[in-house]
Each structure stands twice: as structure tokens, then as C-alpha cells.
A protein has these predicted regions:
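Short helix-capping segments at alpha-helix termini
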Residues: 23-27, 73-75
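Hydrophobic/aromatic residues located in beta-strands of well-ordered beta-sheets
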Residues: 4, 30-31, 79
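Conserved acidic segment of CheY-like receiver
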Residues: 2-13, 17-18, 52
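CheY-like receiver
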Residues: 41-132
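Interdomain helical linkers/hinges and coiled-coil/dimerization scaffolds
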Residues: 92-95, 99-187
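A generic structural motif
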Residues: 25-30, 47
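Conserved Asp/Asn-Gly motif in the active-site loop of CheY-like receiver
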Residues: 31-38
Length: 187
């Protein structure tokens, strides 16, 4: 299941998003639905959703700031912005943040929305498969060789793009004589 977080300060818009499609039927799990962007960030940090769908203009932490905070926190979370505004400045900022899509709320309808998120779902699944393959290949290489801890650390640091947190790197290095340890890191 692809984990999704929905964020919109307008309760009716949020309810519409929550019910626009049958999320579970299409392979999505709603891990959070909130009108509060600060709460959304806390949910993000705890549950690491694969996809965040957020309004852009919200009081307090707006969608752009939320997207920026998510990018700074790390990970490969996909972000889709919704907005009632055709403001080109928002679009430019969203592009700078690497946002996956920007949809005007006035254009939001079930079939088009479903096509967009199913396309994102395919991308997420491909990324997870590639990441899993990369992690497995690197760890198998590490465990096949009889090398020093320092070399292990160098290899792991060079392969930082696989997205493991540093604490896992050190677990791997300290447990390098246990070939099946990498099974714990499958995503």
C-alpha cells in the first residue's frame, strides 16, 4: 500500500479529497487527514508517507513551507499541491521544490485526479523496487568481502543516495558478519 497524507485547512475540501476516490481499493492507505499543516509535518515525521497531497495557501505553515520542510527532512516523498489560486509565483516555487504536480481545485474531478495519483503510485512502486535492489546489492557486496570497518563506512558513505539513516549504516558495519541482517532493511 502507498501511504498518503492529506492536508487542507478547508474542512469541506479535505472531506472531498478524502472521499473523491476509494483510496484502499486503488492501493493507497490514508495515514493522515488533517486541516493543520503543523500536525501534517508531525504525521510526516512519524509515518513517512509516500505521497503528500496538500493545499498551498493555508494559515501558519503554508503548503510551500510544508513541502520545503518535507524536502529538508529527507526521503523521497512525492508531493502534489492543490490550490484555488492560479498564482504563477506559487507554481514557480512548487517547481523549485520538486513538487510532482500542481492542480487547481476548480479543475479537480475524480477521473483526472485518479489518473494523476495512479501515475504517481507507479512511480513510487518503481522507486521502491529500485531502492530495494540497490540496498540489497550494496549489502550483499559488503557481506561477501572480508574488509575492514573503515572500508565498510567508506562504501556506505559513498552510497548515501540509497537513503538509509546513519544509524542503520553503523548497525550494518557492526553486524557485518551476519549476512542476513540486510533483510531487516527491506522497505
Amino acid at each position: 500500500m502507498i501511504k498518503v497524507l492529506l492536508v487542507d485547512d478547508e474542512k469541506l475540501a479535505l472531506e472531498y479529497l478524502e472521499h473523491i476516490i476509494d483510496w484502499e481499493y486503488h492501493g493507497f492507505e490514508l495515514i493522515g487527514v488533517t486541516t493543520n499543516p503543523e500536525q501534517a509535518l508531525a504525521i510526516y515525521k512519524t509515518h513517512r508517507p509516500d505521497l503528500v497531497i496538500s493545499d498551498v495557501k493555508m494559515p501558519g505553515l503554508n503548503g510551500l513551507e510544508l513541502g520545503d520542510a518535507i524536502r529538508e527532512y529527507g526521503g523521497n516523498t512525492h508531493i502534489l499541491f492543490l490550490s484555488a489560486y492560479k498564482n504563477f509565483d506559487y507554481v514557480k516555487q512548487a517547481i523549485r521544490l520538486g513538487i510532482d504536480d500542481y492542480i487547481l481545485k476548480s479543475d479537480l474531478e475524480e477521473d483526472g485526479f485518479l489518473r494523476k495519483i495512479l501515475k504517481l503510485k507507479e512511480e513510487i512502486i518503481k522507486e521502491k523496487a529500485k531502492k530495494q535492489y540497490t540496498i540489497t546489492a550494496i549489502l550483499e557486496e559488503l557481506f561477501r568481502k572480508n574488509i575492514s570497518e573503515e572500508v565498510y563506512k567508506d562504501i556506505l558513505d559513498e552510497n548515501d543516495y540509497i537513503g538509509l539513516h546513519k544509524k542503520y549504516y553503523y548497525i550494518i558495519v557492526s553486524q557485518r558478519k551476519v549476512p542476513k541482517i540486510y533483510n531487516k532493511f527491506y522497505i
